[in-house]
């Protein structure tokens, strides 16, 4: 888009009213760092509950946010920024975090960054520009650590934002191989008027297994006046006291935590770490309360469980496809059902039954096709997921049970017709003059057939609906 078009685009944003809340102060703060797929609303709220002073969102890319629509969600009491192309939530926030949430932005263009800033500034406490991410996606787009190689562009982006927005602007960088060059870079960025700068104490090419360099951060902190936020010490962080120790080693004004918080967000508690099951329960309740995407909730729980995913309970968890199923494992099934019904009554459509959201648009396209409509006309459908871990032996699998039942009753064996959409499958089970199917799309043909057989067994009265609801197979 040309510069003229960008200026025209920006003119559509009215000058926001002055914010009533105090300007965010970055000194003497314990902060949850930006983490991809982790820093969504439930985890941010839990971090604040545990004692964090400031929470950062996961990195959100400017182009994705620019095209989103801001929508108040009265059912959840949230503000949602929605992708109009598929209805997915790009960014969700609420009043519980407004004064303490910082949105981290992935950008390589000052005009785009400003457009995002004007769109979101009334719903956040601060805006941070990612200048440290070494991932290939960021580098190729000229974002993240790529900006470390272009200080002039980095400074221009920051100066544009500090000049035109009412909220404090920060950036997050990595150290350079040379300490003096790092100091020079930080001084150039500080001169743009930013409120603070987060520094990961490793270079662009170093990874978590490498030791951080707190001595470099100490040298930088003594050379500038703005707050320095130390990051990169998770290897040695196991308790709240460890956070303060790393901050002191770096001579920093504040400390920012990523991996240690991802493993157990109760590291922010001054009173001590909580057991992981208690943390997971607290997290899942927030996921239910704020209708968090199941795939995102599952990813965060996996990060907490680590090697416990290999236990029987962990393996059952890995089979889960919905938030309801995950909650059943931690004794929150009734809470999830009750809350989702309550939210539905208040007008929240919800995404509780959606997994693999990257395939959502393809599913919707397939489901709208006339061919599929014809295929599923007259088919008895239920929201039924096949969870392999709930069946101890092959003889108990739904297809086998239905096959044996047909033999005992002298009826023709059931047959299956399966449809495929890219890597997703849905099957119709034909048995005794009727056709049955699950409304879920499964990862493979076998699971799709088992789901269809489950629907048949339930509708024919050979399975108990309450049992299926309790084990998470059936979503009401």
At which residue positions do the language-model features occur?
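Positively charged, aromatic-enriched nucleic acid-contacting surfaces
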Residues: 409-445, 455
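Alpha/beta catalytic cores of nucleotide-metabolism and tRNA/nucleoside-modifying enzymes
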Residues: 1-31, 36, 41-42, 49, ...
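Non-cysteine beta-strand/loop elements that form the S-adenosyl-L-methionine
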Residues: 57, 126-134, 191-202, 254-262
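Active-site beta->alpha loop and helix N-cap motifs at the rims of alpha/beta catalytic domains
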Residues: 79-169, 174-182, 187-190
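Active-site beta-loop-alpha junctions enriched in small/polar residues
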Residues: 35-37, 60-62, 106-108, 132-134, ...
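Short arginine-rich
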Residues: 453-467
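Glycine-rich, proline-tolerant flexible connector loops at the mouths of alpha/beta enzymes
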Residues: 59-74, 131-149, 199-208
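Glycine-rich, positively charged N-terminal anion/phosphate-binding segment
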Residues: 6-24, 35-119
């Amino acid at each position: 888009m040309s510069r003229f078009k960008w200026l025209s685009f920006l003119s559509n944003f009215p000058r926001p009213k002055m914010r009533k809340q105090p300007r965010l102060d970055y000194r003497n703060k314990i902060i949850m760092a930006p983490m991809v797929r982790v820093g969504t609303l439930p985890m941010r709220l839990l971090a604040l509950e545990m004692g964090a002073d400031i929470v950062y969102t996961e990195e959100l890319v400017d182009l994705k946010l620019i095209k989103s629509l801001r929508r108040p969600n009265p059912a959840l009491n949230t503000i949602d920024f929605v992708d109009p192309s598929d209805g997915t939530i790009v960014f969700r926030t609420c009043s519980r975090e407004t004064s303490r949430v910082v949105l981290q932005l992935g950008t390589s263009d000052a005009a785009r960054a400003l457009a995002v800033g004007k769109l979101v500034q009334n719903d956040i406490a601060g805006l941070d520009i990612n200048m440290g991410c070494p991932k290939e996606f960021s580098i190729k787009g000229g974002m993240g650590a790529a900006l470390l190689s272009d200080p002039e562009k980095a400074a221009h982006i920051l100066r544009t934002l500090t000049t035109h927005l009412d909220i404090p602007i920060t950036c997050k960088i990595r150290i350079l191989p040379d300490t003096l060059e790092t100091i020079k870079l930080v001084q150039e960025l500080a001169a743009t008027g930013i409120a603070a700068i987060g520094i990961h104490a490793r270079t662009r090419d170093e990874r978590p297994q490498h030791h951080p360099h707190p001595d470099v951060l100490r040298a930088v902190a003594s050379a500038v006046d703005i707050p320095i936020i130390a990051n990169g010490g998770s290897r040695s962080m196991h308790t709240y006291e460890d956070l303060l120790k790393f901050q002191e080693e770096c001579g920093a004004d504040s400390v920012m935590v990523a991996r240690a918080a991802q493993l157990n967000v109760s590291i922010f508690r001054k009173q001590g770490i909580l057991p992981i099951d208690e943390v997971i329960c607290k997290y899942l309740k927030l996921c239910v309360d704020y209708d968090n995407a199941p795939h995102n909730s599952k990813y965060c729980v996996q990060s907490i469980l680590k090697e416990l995913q290999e236990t029987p309970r962990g393996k059952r968890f890995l089979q889960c496809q919905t938030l309801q199923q995950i909650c059943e494992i931690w004794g929150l099934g009734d809470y999830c059902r009750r809350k989702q019904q309550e939210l539905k009554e208040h007008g929240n459509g919800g995404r509780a039954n959606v997994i693999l959201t990257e395939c959502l648009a393809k599913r919707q396209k397939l489901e709208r096709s006339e061919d599929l409509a014809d295929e599923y006309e007259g088919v008895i459908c239920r929201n039924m997921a096949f969870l392999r871990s709930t069946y101890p032996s092959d003889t108990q699998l739904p297809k086998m049970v239905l096959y044996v039942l047909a033999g005992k009753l002298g009826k023709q064996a059931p047959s299956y017709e399966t449809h495929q959409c890219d890597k997703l499958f849905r099957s119709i089970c034909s048995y005794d003059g009727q056709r049955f199917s699950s409304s879920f799309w499964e990862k493979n043909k076998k699971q799709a057939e088992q789901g269809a057989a489950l629907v048949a067994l339930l509708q024919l009265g050979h399975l108990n609906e309450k049992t299926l609801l309790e084990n998470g197979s059936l979503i009401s």
